[in-house]
UniProtKB/Swiss-Prot annotation:
Start-end of each Gelsolin-like repeat: 53-102, 172-212, 280-323
Keyword Repeat annotated: yes
InterPro entries in alphabetical order: ADF-H/Gelsolin-like_dom_sf, Gelsolin-like_dom, Villin/Gelsolin
The protein, known as: Severin
Length: 362
């Protein structure tokens, strides 16, 4: 069965503590998750997909390829000075199930504990990925389907055509979109993968980076099929676009204009979550430049950077402050009519790294 119900991120219990899902995960994990054995000991990437409440390793050959019906955990181990640091991302596809999303979040906490509680945790939602996440993958694909779809490999001659959308300059993204002329636009590049023929459509206002990325993806698909496909490249303004290209899209039609979005710089806002008074209170601390000295060990702080939300967990904060930090961050997005899929990052006081310090001072 192919999942097609969009994930309601606001109803996902990310902490999962005390729920039936929590119990299910604990039983499945037993005392130690076998997949965590030996991880985080050397620089590099490890990726797991959630399958029936279990974490299943993704082959390295498939790194950077994600399905919109699944949830994943990504561990990035890197050197900072003479020590190893860890970032843990849990990625939620648009059509992943609530159980898969909850399991990914729960297992992320488990992996964090296994690595000593110091890693920085990131919640990544499809189409709203952070630059730090996208930078991990030279090739980044979002494809339709998921573990319930079977992932059956088919021969090129039996291949069901699909349309891939390539957009963005610095960190170009590749995502599968509906196979229709209405999916095209002048500002981006597209690949129509028909099995033995791969059509590259370059929008009239697409960037050189997008064209290069599209060509790179076409070459990767061609190599995967041992050089059998023929690759045809053309621009929106060409007069000799193959008739078969339009036929596969349901017929020739008007191409949408390039979608321009003006860059916006949001004012940083620092909030404090504290129960020092006897009851849990969420209050604004400051706006504009945020000094690290404003972050106190006794409390939890939520930092709104516009395109990302950070929860900073003080080393002496109370159990209740720690437990509710994520839910306050998600509720903050809802209350302020912000996109609920905005990346949320969890940072422990003793687990901060240079990238976090840079964000504060920027």
């Amino acid at each position: 069965m192919i999942k097609n119900r969009k994930l309601d991120i606001t109803s996902t219990n990310v902490a999962g503590i005390g729920t039936d899902l929590d119990k299910k995960c604990r039983l499945d994990a037993a005392s130690t998750e076998a997949q965590w054995k030996g991880v985080g000991q050397a620089p590099g990437l490890k990726i797991w997909r959630i399958e029936n409440f279990k974490v299943v390793p993704v082959p390295e050959s498939s790194y950077g390829k994600f399905y919109d019906g699944d949830s994943y955990i990504i561990l990035h181990t890197f050197k900072e000075g003479n020590s190893l640091k860890h970032d843990i991302h849990f990625f939620l596809g648009t059509f992943t199930t609530q159980d898969e999303a909850g399991t990914a979040a729960y297992k992320t906490v488990e992996l964090d504990d296994f690595l000593g509680g110091a890693p920085i945790q990131y919640r990544q939602c499809q189409s709203y990925e952070s630059p730090s996440f996208l930078s991990l993958f030279p090739k980044y694909f979002i494809l339709s389907g998921g573990v319930e779809s079977g992932f059956n490999h088919v021969k090129p001659t039996e291949y069901k055509p699909r349309l891939l959308h390539i957009s963005g300059d610095k960190n170009a993204k590749v995502a599968e979109v509906p196979l229709a002329t209405s999916s095209l636009n002048s500002g981006d590049c597209f690949l129509l993968d028909a099995g033995l023929t791969i059509y590259q459509f370059n929008g009239s206002k697409s960037s050189p980076q997008e064209k290069n990325k599209a060509a790179e993806v076409a070459r990767a698909i061609d190599a995967e099929r041992k050089g059998l496909p023929k690759v045809e490249v053309f621009c929106e303004t060409d007069s000799d676009i193959p008739a078969e290209f339009w036929k596969l899209l349901g017929g020739k039609g008007a191409i949408a204009a390039k979608h321009e979005t003006a860059p916006t710089k949001s004012e940083k806002v620092l909030y404090k979550l504290s129960d020092a008074s006897g009851s849990l209170k969420f209050s604004e601390v400051s706006r504009g430049k945020i000094n690290k000295s404003s972050l106190k060990s006794e409390d939890v702080f939520i930092i709104d950077l516009g395109n990302e939300i950070y929860t900073w967990i003080g080393s002496k904060s109370s159990p209740n402050e720690k437990k509710t930090a994520f839910s306050h961050a998600t509720q903050y997005l809802v209350n302020n009519k912000r996109c609920e899929y905005t990346p949320i990052v969890r940072v422990l006081e003793n687990g901060t790294n240079q990238s976090f310090e840079t964000l504060l001072s920027a």
